[in-house]
């Protein structure tokens, strides 16, 4: 009856949600939205309307599902060891259905981006190509810690920040003028992404070593990867906090504080970790 069908639908939606890797979806949504608000706050633009933000967000999220889904689809055997709870190794999702979701997500991302603007289409296409190169042979950046960190940094640090900022500026203001905050923010996210690229492999050393993935945690040990990643993340925070404190950057006190508090929390948690 209706109840079993409803339960099946809920299970399917939950499986899809897990397949999207929710933390990446949330991160992408926050980045794309924050950049929109930043551009919107600049004087002289057109009035706020969802016609720019919503389709841009949809294209970004669909592209995110394509990249994370392709990563899982290409890594089933490794994930049986490292992440057996993910939908494919857990038997909740077949590889064929997963591939269908991946390809449909790519199609949605490109079609929506093309509808919005040629620039956004090119941006989403470039991000998708790098996402493919991250997971798929012959390039497969993720097999080597430098390639993985470089790919993640280019996408998260440069293309998303600078690309979506330029896209919104063109749509809302008709020209590209860089806000002074964009450079430091892009540098921060780029450095932060390097640390994250090293951190995320720390729990996965067993499967990565067995399948010859040259991650930093496999090559140098989990403890060294944690320390190096922590150093890079702390440097990212300090690089944006110190110039503001000495007056080199025109940030208000609350802005500097908004970076300082997470830094304190991060250092505190990192000091307690045992790997």
Where are these regions (language model features)?
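Multi-pass alpha-helical membrane architecture of UbiA-family
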Residues: 2-275
């Amino acid at each position: 009856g209706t109840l079993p069908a409803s339960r099946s639908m809920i299970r399917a939606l939950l499986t899809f949600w897990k397949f999207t890797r929710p933390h990446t979806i949330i991160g992408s949504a926050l980045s794309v939205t924050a950049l929109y608000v930043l551009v919107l706050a600049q004087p002289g633009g057109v009035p706020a309307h969802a016609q720019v933000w919503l389709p841009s967000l949809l294209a970004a999220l669909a592209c995110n599902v394509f990249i994370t889904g392709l990563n899982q689809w290409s890594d089933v055997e490794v994930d049986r060891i490292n992440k057996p709870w993910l939908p494919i190794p857990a038997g909740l999702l077949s590889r064929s259905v997963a591939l269908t979701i991946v390809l449909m997500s790519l199609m949605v991302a490109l079609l929506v981006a093309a509808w919005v603007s040629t620039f956004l289409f090119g941006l989403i296409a470039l991000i998708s190509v790098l996402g493919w190169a991250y997971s798929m042979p012959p390039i497969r950046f993720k097999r080597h810690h430098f390639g993985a960190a470089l790919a993640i940094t280019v996408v998260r640090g440069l293309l998303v920040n600078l690309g979506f900022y330029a896209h919104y500026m063109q749509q809302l203001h008709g020209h590209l003028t860089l806000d002074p905050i964009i450079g430091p923010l892009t540098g921060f996210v780029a450095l932060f992404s390097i640390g994250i690229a090293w951190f995320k492999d720390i729990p996965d050393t067993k499967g990565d070593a067995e399948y010859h993935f040259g991650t930093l945690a496999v090559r140098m040990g989990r403890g060294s990867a944690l320390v190096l990643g922590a150093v890079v993340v702390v440097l990212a925070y300090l690089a944006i906090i110190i110039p503001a404190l000495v007056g080199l950057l025109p940030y208000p006190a609350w802005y500097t504080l908004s970076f300082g508090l997470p830094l304190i929390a991060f250092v505190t948690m990192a000091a307690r970790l045992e790997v």
